[in-house]
Amino acid sequence: MPSFDIVSEIDTSELQNAVDNANRELATRFDFRGVKASLSITNDVAKLSAEHDSQLRQLMDLLRTNLIKRGVDSRAMDPETPNHTGKTWTQVIKFKEGVDQPTSKKLIKLIKDNKMKVQVAVQGEQLRVTGKKRDDLQAVMTLIKGTELDQAFQFNNFRD
């Protein structure tokens, strides 16, 4: 029986490249001259810091555009609330990987509500979808791509 997996993964090298490109662009921007602003990443957690909250928002937009340029979906970003300590504003952004329990339940409910002729099984942080026909699996793929969930999904391990 044909099957495929629904996963949510981030290419960490592309994530690092996007942060490096954002840092390069930050160094050349006129509105950030003479301003203490930084952008760093460690273990899939980005840390933004700037002197004003408006500059922090600009850093966030800068990171988001560079992520999109590098092919990393910006829906994987999970920003925390900005923190103001002394003279600097900091914001920590975590990147979501894996399909968590509530999201997998939403996906299963979505597939069941559309009466697709497939079976869905949760396997850790991914979902395995099996069906009798390849067309049913492709219909599930287009259904998931068309929904607005807070996470980016990839389809891999397609077996016939």
Curated annotation (Swiss-Prot):
Xref: InterPro entries: DUF520, UPF0234-like_C, UPF0234_N, YajQ-like_sf
The keyword Nucleotidyltransferase is assigned to this record: no
An annotated GO cellular component: cytosol
Superkingdom in the source lineage: Bacteria
A single GO molecular function term of this UniProt record: nucleotide binding
Classification via Pfam families: DUF520 (PF04461)
Gene3D superfamilies for this protein: 3.30.70.860, YajQ-like, domain 2 (3.30.70.990)
Keywords: Nucleotide-binding
SUPFAM superfamilies: YajQ-like
Biological function: Nucleotide-binding protein.
PANTHER family the record matches: UPF0234 PROTEIN YAJQ
Protein family according to the UniProt entry: Belongs to the YajQ family.
Protein name: Nucleotide-binding protein Ping_2261
Species per Swiss-Prot/TrEMBL record: Psychromonas ingrahamii (strain DSM 17664 / CCUG 51855 / 37)
Lineage, opening ranks: Bacteria, Pseudomonadati, Pseudomonadota, Gammaproteobacteria, Alteromonadales
